[in-house]
Amino acid sequence: VVASGSVRDGSAPIVLVNREGAFELPEGLGTPHYWVGAPVADVDLDGRLDVFGLEWEPSLPSRLFRNVTPGGHWLQVSVADPVGGVGSAVEVFANDGALLGSREIGAASGYSSGKPAVAHFGLGDVDVVSVVITTRAGETVTIDDVQVDVHLRWPDGC
């Protein structure tokens, strides 16, 4: 997704849909828009990331693109501290030690946009993982045998 080109030239945002390896423009997006941002978050809490196109022009609508693709396993991680975990690093490992993903928790997403302070991981077929969290203060914690398809809050219950 390219959220914007230029407000002055009437550029249309580029949104392509992957259909079996061929990318296509979805229906209804042939008119010029100027999306100043396109934050990504799991809006409907189904484990798949959705995109929200923020329209610049007040007379034109912003648009939520719900991800309705077949989903695999997933994990979301948040950290409770005075700044909502922003700056904490999260790594997720398979049981064999393979790194599945690494994220830094942040709350910014482009111009004039924000997102939840959550690290999101798509895990495919993996159903149990280990999570390593390193806080801004430098504290590192490892949590083994984490079940997936959940929002893990650390410390527990944050």
Q: Where in this protein do the model-derived segments appear?
A:
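Beta-propeller blade signature
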Residues: 16-17
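Electropositive polyanion-binding surfaces
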Residues: 1-2
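Gly/Ser/Thr/Pro-enriched helix-cap/hinge segments flanking short amphipathic alpha-helices
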Residues: 6, 12, 23-158
